[in-house]
Amino acid sequence: MKKNLIYPVLFLTSFLLSSQEKTSYQIPKKELLELIDVELAPTVIKDSKNENMVLLYRDAYKSISDLSQEELRIAGLRVNPSKYIGSRTTYYKNVKVLKLSNSKEPNQLQGLPLNPKLSNFKISPDESKIALTNTTDEGVELWIADLKTLSAKKIYGSNINSTLGNPITWLKNNNELLIKTIPNSRKPLIDRNSIVPTGPTITENEGQKAQNRTYQDLIKNPDDAFNFTQLSLSNIIKITLEGKQKNFLNSKMYRSVSVSPDGSLVMVSFIKTPFSYLVPYYRFPTEYRVYKNSGDLVK
């Protein structure tokens, strides 16, 4: 009887051990892989003079590494808090340029980093260059692509703040840009999973009845408000194509930066407190200011 019981026990033990083995992701068969992993048609940027067509290439699917990145959902945003860029950002892996006047095949843009994650493309006013960002393990870098020489170079390190959208604005002289950067005064984010609440979250409607739209990923408490502030604060610096930089505007929660047609004025918008717990960041109180190209406020 004991001997008969031994075999089922051994079988069950071996089954449990095999089921606990760590299994890695598997690559499908070649036929299936070729069917799924088809190169997408490139995204196109074309200048107004019909001289250059910039072709942006990306993978059909995000990598497991990209999907496993940290994500913070706050104020209607989904942000990678360690890199200050949207966690759902579409990244491009290659850039080619087609000369519409004399080329039938696109030319490779030279000088791009190895395994790049490119985004935030902005063409210069004279349409001869494109500014773009490259996201690395350290953060977001600024790169410039010259459409005449078909070469790219990095001009600013891993400190760009892309939390509230594209951080790049060209100035009209085609030699300078305004970029949003992470301030040195930033504070560590609050980890909600490691703290005990000290009180309830309270909202008031002053006794009024009103319809209210619902949104995802809103600010829910003071800790969320603190984290949103730290992620959104940025300085605006002026930088040349040679990488020379100087401070333009001090730290605020800048949403947008735009330049007047003659290039003499810069208008910025920035978010102000108090934050709403009912709507996303783009419906928060916003102030607009106009500055001279020198950084002096226009009164």
Model-derived segments and spans:
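Generic N-terminal leader/processing signal
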Residues: 1-2, 20
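Sec-dependent signal peptide recognition
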Residues: 2-9
